[in-house]
Amino acid sequence: AIPCGESCVWIPCISAAIGCSCKNKVCYR
């Protein structure tokens, strides 16, 4: 998995728009 440089502790991954998803409080794709 590639980190998207975004955390998802309080809010969902905005980078989900480019295929990222939340894993262990960090957004990965």
UniProtKB/Swiss-Prot annotation:
Sequence position, cross-link Cyclopeptide (Ala-Arg): 1-29
Post-translational modification summary for this protein: This is a cyclic peptide.
Keywords of the record: Antiviral protein, Disulfide bond, Knottin, Plant defense
Keyword hit for Disulfide bond: yes
Domain of life: Eukaryota
GO process annotations (BP): defense response; regulation of defense response to virus
Disulfide bridge positions per record: 4-20, 8-22, 13-27
Record bears the keyword Disulfide bond: yes
Function: Probably participates in a plant defense mechanism. Inhibits the cytopathic effects of the human immunodeficiency virus.
Comment field on protein domains: The presence of a 'disulfide through disulfide knot' structurally defines this protein as a knottin.
Family according to the record: Belongs to the cyclotide family. Bracelet subfamily.
Name of the protein: Circulin-F
Organism listed in the record: Chassalia parviflora
